[in-house]
Every structure is written in structure tokens, then in C-alpha cells.
Amino acid sequence: MNNSGSGGSSPFVESPDLVSDGHLHTERKDTPIDVDNWKYKYDNLLNQYEIEKVRWQKEQYDSEKSHEALHLQLEKARNEIDQLVESKRFLEAQLQSQHPQNTQKEWSHEDNKVNNNSMNNDYMLLEEKYKSDVFHLDNSVNELKLELTSCRSLLKKYEEVIEQQSEQIKEIKKTLKKKEQELDEIEVNRLKQAHNATNTEEIRQQTNENASFSNGYNTLMSMKNSVNYWKNENQQLNQKLSEYSDIYQQLQEAQLEIMELKANLEEWNKFLSNKKQQDNSNDYSIDHFIIEFESQRRELNMVTEELAEVKKSYYNSKILNDELALERNQLLKLKDDYENNIINLEKLNHELEQQKVLLEEECSLLKNQIPTKENLNQQIRSTNRNDAEYDSLLDNYKQETENLTNELKRLNDSLIEQNRNQGTEMKKRKLRNGDHININYSQRLNELQQNNLSLEKDNEKLRLVVEKLEGKLDDLRKTKPKNIRILQQRDSPLLKLQFVRRKENELLREENQNLLTMIENITENRNESFDKIPLTSYNSLKYQYEISMDTNKKQEKKFSRLKQIFNKKSLEFIDVVNSLLGFKLEFQQDGRVKIYSCYMPNKYLIANLVDNTLKSNLDTVISDWDSLLNDWVVEKGQLPCFLASLTLQLWKMENDS
């Protein structure tokens, strides 16, 4: 069933036959494959090295982290043991210092002993527990240290292996460069040989052309000499004409100036005659006009100066008005602030008075309680000898209550005085400010005018500098050399991969910082439980999920594209088979192929490629079906010939019908 004929076609593109051009062609064919293989090996080794390096760095970081955590736990356990020892010593010292003075204290002492024994037992249990924990932690630390040493040794081995492989790769690159240079030299020699063969024929043609060119050259030289002579004559004539044209232009300009001067003289004469008629005097001349003009110009300058002074005074008064308005607003704000402060102080005073009343009531209650306490003290004196301490405590308490009442009175007095002083100071400030405002404003106006002039000068200087720099910039832009631009794909896979790695690195750093802070919080708050996950770990997982979704989408697009290409090519293949062989193929499940004839589409053949069986409904149409099947398929094993004979018979039947 294989279509091995020379006239058959396939749906896939066949590779063209390579014409052997000797040793040179074979070298050209083999070297790119070797280069690609070596590059592929080099990339694989680099990737393996980076993966192993990252893995070992991660393991080292995890081991160091766990070692630090264990070390912290050890220190905490030791600190707790020290605290328990100190508390035990403190309790023992208290027990030794306290002696029983009556039967009740003896009972309490016995209770304390019982409690102390229970605490000692608890302490012993805790000590044993912490010792066992310390032993386990030491063992785990030693195991981690051994793992660290083994990991470092393995890392060194991997680094040595990678260095050796990198040296081998460098040597391979050198050999590749040498081979490429040899290939370039061979190509240059081949091109030179081909070029030399064509040069001999070109030299012959050029000798013939040179002879014809020499004859033409002589004729051209004679013509050139005559042309140069006439050119010189023409230039001399043109120079004379240009001189005449310049003189003619000067003459026209002089005539125009004379006409303008005449018109000006006529205007002056008219003006002088009009002036003489107005003044009724024959002595009026141009000198009189100049004197009048200068006097009017002086008057105009005086008026402009007066106007400038008026403008300046108006501007100064406007500035004064604005500043006074600002001062007024500030004073109003200060007034509001002081009023708010007074209200707040009154509230404070009211609260303090309430506190004073409460304290006085407390003092009265305490004074009422003093006689009852004195009776109690007398009873205690009969039983205990330490009555002097209680008396001193009562005296101190009385003194403190008296001091508190005195402080409350003093605070109220000071608040009242502050309110009064603030009111008087506000009035004094307003009076002082009102007297000195005009002087301060005049001084400030002069200073501001001087500053304004200096700033305007600086502004002009800077503007000139900016104009110069802008001119230089324009010159530089005009004379800017063309830069060499390196083309790069906008959406290249390398840029995408770098962007993804950079984003993953940033997310991992943030996650690492958050986890470290979380570990510190857990170590500080040992009793609290932390059931939350940091947001950065969720963000990193989300980013990885988005990347995986993007890759899935790309793979799905690629798969759908390949599926479309496959369907298109398979349809082309079926159409080609139908047009060339006269059969339409339909591939079914379980390795079955259904074959329809183009001459009788309702009849078919089913070939099972797994069981090597053949079924058909053509036996009702073709009379000698069994004989053809036995002859071609069973005896000779030629299924293509059997199908060809079927097509011939079906074609005859179609023509006969």
C-alpha cells in the first residue's frame, strides 16, 4: 500500500538534492551543524551550572537560616533557665530573711515551704526538659554543620568541573574560529580564480576600445582649445557689461536721492511759510524751530518723570495696602487663636476646680478614716513592735494630701494670672505695632525696590546666557553626527525572559523580607500564633500563575495553529490522492482506512491495517471480484495493482452507462 512511484506526490515539502561540489561543499555543509551542536552543549552546561548553583545556594541559605533559628532558641532557653535560677535564689533569700513572729506566720511559712518544694520540683522538671532540648538542638546544629561542609565540598567540586568544561568550550570556540577563517580564505581564493578567468577577455576588449578612445580624444582636445578661447572672450565682455550695470544703478540711486531731497526742501519751505503767516514775522527760521522742539522735548521729559513718580507712589501705596491687609488678617487670626486659648484655659480651669473639689472630698474622707486607722494602729501596736513605720506612713500621706491641695491652689492662681497677662500683652502689642508700622513699611519698600532692581539685572544676564546656550545647542544639533543604531526586536524572547526573571527576583526579595520580619515577630511573640501568610508570597504565586496561564495560552494557540496546518495539509493530501489515484481516503479509528472511488462514490473499501483485512461492497457491482482479489492480493500481494484494476473496470462501467 506504499506509494513508491516516481510520479507520486506527498503533502510535505521535500528537501532538494544537494549537488556535491567537492571537498569545499562538504565542509560548508558540516561546519554549521558542528557549531550548533557545540553551542547547544555549551548552553546546556551553562544552564545546568546555573540551576545547580541556585539550588546549592538555596540549600545553604536554608541551612544557615535554620542554624540561626536553633541558635536563637538555645539562647532563649538559657536565658529562661538563668531567670528561673535567679527567681529561685530570690525566693530562698526572702524565705531566709522572713522569720516567723506568731503562729499564723508559722503556718504561712509552712505553706511557703510546700509551695517552694512544688516550685523546686517544677524547676527540676523544667531544667531537665530544657537540658534535653539543648541536647537535641546541639545534635541538630552539628548535623546541619556536617551538611553545610558536605554542601560546600560538593559546590567546590561542581565549580571545578564547570571551570574545566568552560576551558574546553573556549578551546572549541578557538578551533571553530580557525575553521571559519580557513573557510573564508578558501572562498576568497575560489572567487579570485573565477575573476582572473573573466579578466583576460575584458583586457582584449579594453585594448580595442582604448584605440578608438585615443582617436576620439585627439578630436575632442582640438575642440576644447577652440571652446576655451571663445569662453575667455565671453568672460571679458561679461565683466564690462557688469561694470556698466553697476554704474547705471549708482546713477539711478543718486537721481532718487536728489528727488527725495527736493521734496523735503519743498515741505520745509511750506512749513516755514505757514509759520511766518501764523506769527506775522519774517524772521522765523529753522533755528527757531529747533529751539521750540528742544523746549517741548524737555517739557515732555518732565511730564514723563512726574508720571513715573506718580506711578511709583501709586504702586508703593498699593503694596502698603496689601501688606496692611495681610497684617490685619494675621492679627484677626491671632485674635481668634487667643480667644480659643482663653476658652480652652477656662475649660481647664473648670476641670481643675472640679478635680480640686474631688480632692478636697477625698481629703475629708481620709481625715474621717484617720481615727479608725489610729484605733487599728493601737491594736497592731499591742501585737507588733513595728508601729513607728505605720506612723511615719500616715504622716507622709497627710503631707502629700496637703501638698496636693497647695499645688491645686497655686495652679489656679497661675492660670488666672496668665489670662490677665495675655490680655494686657495683646493690647500693648497692638499699640506698639500701630506706631511703628509706617516706619517699617517705608524701610521694607526701599529694600524691596533695591532687591527688585538687582533681580531684574540678574534676570537679564541669565536671559542672555540662556540665549547663548540655546544658540550653541542649535549649532550642536545641526552638526550632530549620525549615531550607530543597533536594531533589536521589540518583543524578543530574550527580553521577555529577562523581564520575567527580573520581576520574579523582585517578588522573591519582597517575600524574603516579609518572611524575615514575620520570623522576627514570631520569635519576639512566642506565645502568639501567626496563621497568616504574607502578601508578597501570594503576589509571587499569583505572578507565577499568570506566567503559567500565558504559557498555556501560547501553547494552546500554537496547538490550534498546528492543528489547522495539519488539517489543511491532510485535506491537500486527500485531494492530491483523489486527483492522481482516483480514490478518496477517510481515516477512521483502530487503524482503519475507508477508500471511496471517484467513479462510484456510494461504493467503498475498508482496509484494516492492524488485522490486514479488507472489506467492500463492490462485489455486487464487479462480476469477477473474487478472481481479481485472489489473483492480485492473495497470490501476488500487490494491492496497488488490485486497486488500479478496480478503477479501470469502474471507469469502463461509467462510460458504458
Curated annotation (Swiss-Prot):
InterPro entries: Mad1. Residues 20-29 have a biased composition (Basic and acidic residues). Its main location: nucleus. Central component of the spindle assembly checkpoint. Belongs to the MAD1 family. Residues 96-105 have a biased composition (Polar residues). Keywords: Cell cycle, Cell division, Coiled coil, Mitosis, Nucleus. It is found in: Nucleus. This is Spindle assembly checkpoint component MAD1. Residues 46-99, 136-533 form a coiled coil. Residues 1-29, 96-116 are annotated as: Disordered.
